[in-house]
Amino acid sequence: MSNTTEKKMPQQQQVERPTALAPADAEIERVFTRFDADGDGRISPSELAAVTRAIAPPPSESAGGREVAAMMNELDTDRDGFVDLGEFAAFHGRGRGDAEHEAELRAAFDVYDVDGDGRITAAELGKVLGRIGEGCSAEECERMIASVDVDGDGCVGFEEFKKMMCRDAAATGGADKAKTE
């Protein structure tokens, strides 16, 4: 039995959408659910804006609006004004070039590195998770940091963060394809 259903569109534009994610993609579904504040199964521009403001407030309202519009343009492939789970999962599964992937990882790292010192502490992790509604105790944050802290300094540097993100992407099937050169 197929894991997809066909969305009714004009013949040359028919697109298959996943009806359910594979168990390995449960993390993507969990993140999608956090973005989908009203639980209607799709992310609206206002929901996307709320999450981006919580993670990293823009320098100005107009800059934030442009950023959300650019993200919606990339994510909303069927142009219905919303991002559904299939579009969200497809975006996270797209292959990226090494330089682009490195830049995305650096940007993600910088969100958590609140003081900009090149290290993520348990306190910084707790602050960012709190902003997005993922309340964690100090002990939970310390455990998360310790699970990634290879050099034992009590913090997560960029290289440790990058290894953790690549490991997690591989575990969920979202890793970039290995180079064959």
Curated annotation (Swiss-Prot):
Residues reported to bind Ca(2+) 4: 149, 151, 153, 155, 160
Annotated positions binding Ca(2+) 1: 36, 38, 40, 42, 47
KW Glycosyltransferase (keyword) present: no
Pfam families, alphabetized: EF-hand_7
InterPro entries per record: EF-hand-dom_pair, EF_Hand_1_Ca_BS, EF_hand_dom, EF_hand_pair_protein_CML-like
UniProt entry keywords in alphabetical sequence: Calcium, Metal-binding, Repeat
Region (Disordered): 1-24
Binding site for Ca(2+) 3: 113, 115, 117, 119, 124
Binding site for Ca(2+) 2: 76, 78, 80, 87
Domain EF-hand per the UniProt entry, residue ranges: 23-58, 63-98, 100-135, 136-171
SMART domains associated with the record: EFh
Molecular-function GO terms, alphabetical: calcium ion binding
PANTHER family documented for this protein: EF-HAND CALCIUM-BINDING DOMAIN CONTAINING PROTEIN
Function summary: Potential calcium sensor.
Name recorded for this polypeptide: Probable calcium-binding protein CML16
Organism: Oryza sativa subsp. japonica
